[in-house]
Each structure stands twice: as C-alpha cells, then as structure tokens.
Amino acid sequence: AEFLNRVYTNAWLKLPVGKARYGVMLREDGIVMDDGTTTRISENHYHMTTTTAQAANVLSHLEYYLQLVWPELNVNVVSTTEQWAGAAIAGPNSRALLMKLFPNTDVSNEGLPFMGYKEADLFGIPAKIYRISFSGELAYEVNVESDFGNFMWEKIIEVGKEFQIQPYGTEALSTLRIEMGHVAGSELDGRTIPHDALSLIHISEPTRLARI
C-alpha cells in the first residue's frame, strides 16, 4: 500500500481487501502518465490495471522506482497481461446477466458494491469479478485464465441472448466515456496535468448509474 501511495496521486493505505480504487499516475514533471484501477486482492496482494498503450511503460516505471529510488520497500511487480482474459459487461441488464452466469455468487448491489471485487465460479472455471464501470453505466469486468478466454466469451454471448446482448468495441467505449465525462485515452497524450483532464473530480464523484 505504501508503494501505491507513492506512485499514485491519491491515498491507498486504507483500501480494504475486496475493493478497487481509481488512481492517476504522474511523471516527475507532474504530467499524467497513466490512469487505471488497482484492486486489493488480499492483505499484501494488489491487481493493477493500466491503459493498453502504457502497460509496458508503467511496468518499467514501477520497476525503476523499486530498484533505484525506494529499494527499502519489499515489493515485487509482475505483468499478468498474458495470463488473464477479460470481458467488460455493461448496461442496465448487466447485473441480471451476471446472476445467470454466476448463480452461486451474490452480485447484488449489497453483495458486490461499486468498485467491489469477488472471486467466483464460471461454469466450473475460476473467475474474478470487478464491479468497475468504464462507460458510466452499471458495469462489471470478468477475468478468467487466458486459456479459457474463448469459453468465457461464448458463455457470455450464449447466456446474454435473452437480454439482446451485443458486443461493443473501443470506438463505442470512447464515445460512451466522453458522453459521461470520463477521461478518454486521447486526453492522456503526455501533455496533460490532472486538473486539465478533471481526473481528480472523477475520482471523488463517480457517476450515479455506476453505483446503482
């Protein structure tokens, strides 16, 4: 947690196990380097996400500070990008769909609140569920081991037919983020400070729909 405190602009020491938090990472000159969510999986185990374009740079950034600036911190970082396959499920029926996919897991608003995390079973496959919204709507991210990525996708599409589920891509996601006032990737172009991107406002004021 102390390491996260130093590399992000916001506080992490009191983040409880099973919860995620949005963070903004700055360069030494105060320019936004990246943003993303980090989840506390267990007492000393965190799962950090980054933007796709900056994943390698963020890993190098973290390793540099651990090895040369704060060697006293007992922290190890490892990329798990290739180990997990993820799917974002968003929209007003996303919770109803999750209830079908995970019938033995409580995904109600009380059981899995906004920015919450749970481990679950997807038709016999271990899965991780994050209550995270990239578009401002009620949304979740489901991760499984990469070998089961196709299996997960097929199950989501199959079970989602009764909800008229439709795949959406990055262009649609970017439009949704702009409509909801979220920071879009094009705004983090290496010339942006947090105030310009209104990042800190979005940290403290998540959209109402995402919290229902």
How would you name each of these model-derived features?
Residues 1-45, 49-68:
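Extended, compositionally biased flexible segments
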Residues 41-204, 208-211:
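Conserved, structured C-terminal
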